[in-house]
Amino acid sequence: QVIASVDEQGREQLRTGGRFLDWPTSQNEPAINAGLQALVIMSLEAGEQLEQVLKNDSLSSLCRTTVERMRQAIPDYKQSKQSAALAALAGLAAPEQCNEILSEGGVERYSTFYGYYMLQAKAMAGDYAGAMDDICRYWGGMLDLGATTFWEDFDIAWLKNAARIDELVPAGKVDVHRTYGDYCYKGLRHSFCHGWASGPTAWLTEHVLGVTIVEPGCRVIRIDPHLGDLKWVEGSVPTPYGVVKIRHERRKDGMIKSQIDAPKKVKIIR
């Protein structure tokens, strides 16, 4: 069905159900079109890999040739940070070029769900420091207001004159929960505990702690940390063979000293 939705010019023509990326872009048709083009490409690339494992050469080839056709139809991905991030991840545009769009206005026009993909695109561009700063400002903004879990939606502008959510609202302060939200989550219906806003947790493990699973079952793990301006970072990753414990420290000469404790059946690549 997905392959059948791609026309001869390589443009996705998904029409079953609503065309949607996230609520903040729901009125931005060019962004939706660009985002769906990127998502279909990534889906078919994953499909090609799966069919190779299943020895289905004909369907694997069909996925590949469809993606090649789609790459000739470059959408207008510059209409939102969501579509710019997806364009980078799908290989439709240079990550450095997309990062220029993602960096405009700092974390203005970020979104809680696609924020993860924005961080991934910035990492592809080598802008780890910028991504970490965005985490501090955007997700840190929620923490500054008393959050203990991340929210369904957040706009950096909400910080202005805002009361914390863990205290009674003082006179003259803005009640963030009652005042903000949009679409189907206006006012007190706005969730303050939303799993899809937790992307930085995975991103920090992958890029700051530096963990990439290389082989199925976690038999081989690559560790390549990016500390930014942090002096140290510490974390752990569960595997079927036990927990991998990792600590990185920045030495005075700027080099990173790593301490890695891994189960014997897990091979570590540095």
What kind of region is each of these model predictions?
Residues 1, 38-56, 85-95, 116-126, ...:
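Well-ordered alpha-helical scaffold segments within catalytic/enzyme domains
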Residues 65, 133-270:
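Non-catalytic C-terminal accessory modules of carbohydrate-active enzymes
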Residues 44, 64, 71, 102, ...:
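Inward-facing hydrophobic residues that define packing positions of alpha-helical scaffold repeats
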Residues 75-77, 101-110, 137-144:
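Solenoid-like repeat scaffolds
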Residues 28-39, 106-110, 123, 196:
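Extracytoplasmic/periplasmic, Sec-exported soluble proteins
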Residues 78-83, 109-115:
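Generic helix N-cap/helix-start motif at coil->alpha-helix transitions
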Residues 1-38, 51-89, 93, 145, ...:
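Active-site acid/base region of carbohydrate-active enzymes
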